[in-house]
Amino acid sequence: MMKAVIATCLLLLVNGVLSVEWKHSAVLDNNFLVLWTPGERDVMFEIQVKTLGYVGLGFTRDDGSVGADMVIGWVDNNGQLHLQDRHVKNSSKDPQMDSSQDYSLLLGYENKTHTVLRFSRRYDTCDPRDLKITNDTMQVVWQYHVEEPVSAAGVLPDHDAIRGSRPLYLVQRDAQPKPTSRNQEAEPQLQTWDILNQQVRLPKGQDTLLWCRVLRMPNIDHKHHVVKYEPVIQPGSHDYLHHMTLYECRRDQALLESAAKTSGSVCYEPNQPSLECNTIAAIWSLGSEGFNYPPEAGYALDPHTGPRYYMLETHYTNPQMDAFISDSSGLRLHYTDKLRTHDAGILSVGIDPNWRHIIPPGQPDVISEGHCISDCTGHTIPNSGINIFAVIMHTHQLGRKVRLRQIRSGEELPPIASDTNYDPSYQEYRKLQKPVRVYPGDHLIAECTYSSKSRQAITLGGLSTREETCLVSTLYYPRIELSLCYSLPSLPTVLQSLGIQKLMGSSPVKIQEPQKLSGMTLEERLLSYDWETSFQSFREATRGGTFKPLCWTNKGVLPGTENLEVHYPRILRPYEEVNLPCSKKPLRNKLSMLLSEDEDIGAPVDPDSDETNAVERGQLVRSKVSRSSDGPTGGSSSTRSVPPMVLILTILVVVVGGTFR
């Protein structure tokens, strides 16, 4: 009996080290795959790179490598594994060795084609040269070469080194389930609904196109739940797609049926009848891979009580105004009749895209706020509240920070979501670690911070990417009627912020008072305003003025809110972030595997990754396990250190052997 128990423990221990279910993965280029799983205090990574030279992964807050916190590793010709904590401190792009080595090696080896490293690090290592891993957008940088360094602590081969960077969420990221046999057994049979455009022509010479297509829901006779969706992007169209939004439509069924028989048209033309497509069903933005609903909720497709028609709004962008493409991209929804506990909904909070949203030029920080007032939430959210489980943030080119604030009875709660390193080119759903409860009467604020230093003229709110927007869309359950909760600075507030006292006339409207501005049009005032000296007074007037709330349900404007003009909410207890002192405790010692050249460890490779980037099982050429140490630098050593976990394994082997004898 004892023999079986010990053997089982040994098998489970080894199996647990080699077999990891990764929560996230990203193909950084055709030869570089990174997998990672966030833990409570640290993050575990694995990189699989098609090279037998050195490999590196790093993190920074911008899209350059200067200042990057990097980990570099390789297997040398003597079979020794090297893993080094480095940083890039100047424009040479050469990662320098850190005096503090803060990455913990878990596993590493080579086969005939790939180098594989598995390691972990703290979110905050307390090292000023290391970047904190937070909920912000992180710029992930990578680097690899066909050659290895000549010496462990020396300069890395730089000529022909392959480098790249891309923005990613490392923590608040939707886990994309892999189609393993276990998932297939647990997940019910899914049906798909492809909502695609039909050969939309992007006209040459036009930098923005909003295209709307109405479609009828699938032919189903009972309620289903959408459990995930993803983009379907036509090859060659990716650079021209900014975002796609799927709306529910509930207007006259005959009008919608007529629209569904066409391939679509330009959105929101003045002579078009309103289709009243106000409630968002799904959103895709640049950088997103789609979304998986949590097990307790799904988006309802109901032929009896829900909408039968949907409108796909596609925002095309062509900044060079040189494209003449024909696009058939769209969304793919996966749905099932195995219903989940809750119907999910989308509630969008932000600023109505309108010229009253003004961003002055030449400023490093311009803050704009869109309000979902307590009157809107008080009349639509049940007493038990709603649970927000994911958010997606949206600005155009000037956005640098975004957060969704929550005010309750004069107290500001921690932000529902926040990104102080927002990247407009990467807009992905963030899945919150725990759902956040919103109760009736809560006041929500979508706060966007812009940098307009690159602009010499004002930027106004609007739909074009040259204009700006501020929007945070939340996924929540259970579903309520409220769908769009926007605000807009009132006209008196805008006029006061520009020093205008009175208007006169029409077509065009001109300024009557004060006298020094008399006869100017609004456009002339906006263009001639001295933003450099008057920016602070403009900001104070905007913040202290009134705004118009816009509360939309699937039936139209929420009754009782049509004519409201309200002030900024009174916050008696502002939220203050608590910065805990950094505690640099050593990471738990991890298992490093001691392997011979002929052993097949069952390489921990993503089974669904591209064949060109998959490490083949059982083809180990060299495999190492001890963390190299060259004094304090973590370089190479002529003697192999044996971690305590390896000693435990050795003792277990001896015990098992003795017991069997």
Listing of model-derived features with the role each one plays in the protein:
Residues 243-251, 400-411:
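Short, surface-exposed beta-strand/strand-loop-strand elements in extracellular ectodomains
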Residues 603-646:
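C-terminal GPI-anchoring signal of eukaryotic secretory precursors
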Residues 125-127, 317-321, 449-458:
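Short acidic/polar inter-strand loop motif in beta-rich domains
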Residues 15-186, 259-287, 291, 440, ...:
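Extracellular-facing/secreted segment signature in eukaryotic proteins
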Residues 278, 282-304, 423-440:
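Beta-sandwich interaction modules
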Residues 26, 174-240, 320-397, 460-542, ...:
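Solvent-exposed, flexible loop/coil segments flanking beta-strands in beta-rich domains
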Residues 637-661:
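Cleavable C-terminal sorting propeptides in eukaryotic secreted/cell-surface proteins
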Residues 116, 227, 301-316, 436-450:
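Noncatalytic modules at the cell exterior or secretory-pathway interfaces
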